[in-house]
Amino acid sequence: MEIVPLGDSALVVRVREQFEDAPEETLDEALRVFQLLQRAAIPGVIELAPAYTSVAVFFDPIAVSRSNGAANVLFDELATRIRSAIIPASRRHRRRTAARGTRLTEIPVCYDAEFGFNLDRVAEHTKLSEREVIDIHSTGEYRVACIGFVPGFTFLAGLPKNLSTPRRDVPRKEIPPGSVGIGGTQTGIYPLRSPGGWNLIGRTPLKLFDPTKDPPTLLCPGDRVRFRAITREEFESLKQ
C-alpha cells in the first residue's frame, strides 16, 4: 500500500499497482480500505472515492492541520492517520468489510436497435452476431468498481473478454440517460444525459441517480450486477 498526494487537498491510497492480475481481490481490498476510512471518520476528511486499485481521500487542509506548517506536513499528518486506521485491521475486519459489498442488483435492459446504436459495431468487432452479444452481456455477472465521470455513472468490471470493444473514435455530444455501453474492457451505464464515447448496446428504464434520495445512486461500489434482457413493451412499462 502507498499513499501519494493528489493536488493540495487530496491523497490517494493505492492498494495495488495492477487491477487485471487479481480483479476480485483488488476490488475487495480497495473496498475494505474505503470502509475502514469511513468508520475512522478522520477529522477534516470531507469525501472518500473508491476506484479500481485505490481510494481518493479529499480533505479540508485547515481542518486537518494542527499547525501552520508546509504542505508536506499536512500530507504526512493525514497519511499517518490513514495508516493508523487501516493497518491495525485484523483478518476478521478484512472479511467483514469485504463482504459488505456483495449486494446483487438486476438491471433490466432493452437491447433493441432503437437503443443499441452501436450493437452492430460491437458485433462486427467481436465477430459475434448481435444476438450473441446480447446473450453474453446479459448472462454475465459484474462488479461495480467505482462511480465517477458524472454522478451515478457505474464502471463495471467483469466484462467477458470476447465482448471487449474499443471506444468510438468520435464521442457523442449527448447520450440518453440509462444507456448501457461497452468501452474497452469495461461496461457501464450512463445515468444522466451527457457526452460519451462508449459503444451503446441498450438502455435501462431504471433511474440510476436521484439527488433527493440517500444514497443518491442506485448502485454502490462493490455491488454485483446482472443485466436482464427485456422487450420494448417491458421497457415502457417499467419506465412509468
Residue ranges, per PLM feature:
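Glycine-rich active-site loops that engage anionic ligands at enzyme catalytic sites
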Residues: 1-96, 101-240
